Amino acid sequence: MISFGMPTLIELNSLEESAALCRELGLKFIELNMSFPQNQLEKLDADELLRIKERYGIFYTVHLDEELNPCSLNSGVRQAYVENVLGVVELAKKLGIPTLNMHMLRGIYCTLPTKRVFIYEENEAVYLEYLRQFRDRVTEAIGDSGVKICVENTDGFDLPFLLHGLDLLLESPAFAMTYDIGHDYAINCADKPIIMERAARLRHMHMHDALGTKVHLALGDGEMDLESYLRLAEEHDCRVVLETKTVAALRQSARWLYGRTV
């Protein structure tokens, strides 16, 4: 069964305010975005999170820091990111957080006269080794808790090293997939075949409408066949974040979704 939730919204000043809106709209969870200052690991109080969770009858997922790079060539930076994720895993186990959403970064590139060359592309063996180390440490930490780290399509899996990295992560049962349908639509659904080939590992979805390359629209404001994605989410029991950027767009998306005034 699908569970619908909301993202961290910059207009809302506190988690309690977000939780109140989440309950008002009939949503089930809040995705805590760790790119926001209030959601840094050292600022997240497990007891307070639990209090809000119980008061409003919701749960949480986590969007890991969008700059997370466990493959950084700088060993200190790499270790810091890995330790951060391990800390989030421990928090997730305490609070029953089922999903940690993760981006895969392309890294830096060099612009040659005829093409871009990505550093990770030229050093794929190193990239994959660091990713393997990350996967194995996280898998051990997660154990049998049921927490999943879901890898999101963001800018596309068009670079071979990204696809190889995705499949390396999916070798572990601790990893699964997030399908961001709006971002995929903006690149002419280039990632859809990749997602569908691995659909058995689909657990999470970021849902927003799109009009051409304009994304994060309220549901119903774009041109996407949203019903087909809802069927896909239903088939795989996905948790679905209504990933708008404003409260107004979130309200509109909830109205569209439930067909009622909220």
Where are the language model's segments positioned?
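N-terminal pre-domain/capping segments
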Residues: 1-93, 258-262
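Histidine-acidic metal/acid-base catalytic patches
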Residues: 1-3, 12, 16-23, 71, ...
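A cross-domain feature marking catalytic cores of carbohydrate-active enzymes
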Residues: 6-10, 32-36, 60-66, 102-104, ...
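Soluble or luminal CAZymes and related metallo-dependent hydrolases
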Residues: 14, 41-44, 80-84, 123-134, ...
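Hydrophobic "anchor" residues on beta-strands that sit immediately upstream
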Residues: 27, 59, 148, 176, ...
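Short secondary-structure capping/turn micro-motifs that flank functional sites
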Residues: 38-39, 69-70, 108-109, 158-159, ...
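Alpha-helix-loop-beta-strand connector modules within alpha/beta enzyme cores
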Residues: 49-67, 129-142, 226-232
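Active-site acidic/histidine proton-transfer and metal-coordination neighborhood
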Residues: 55, 74-176
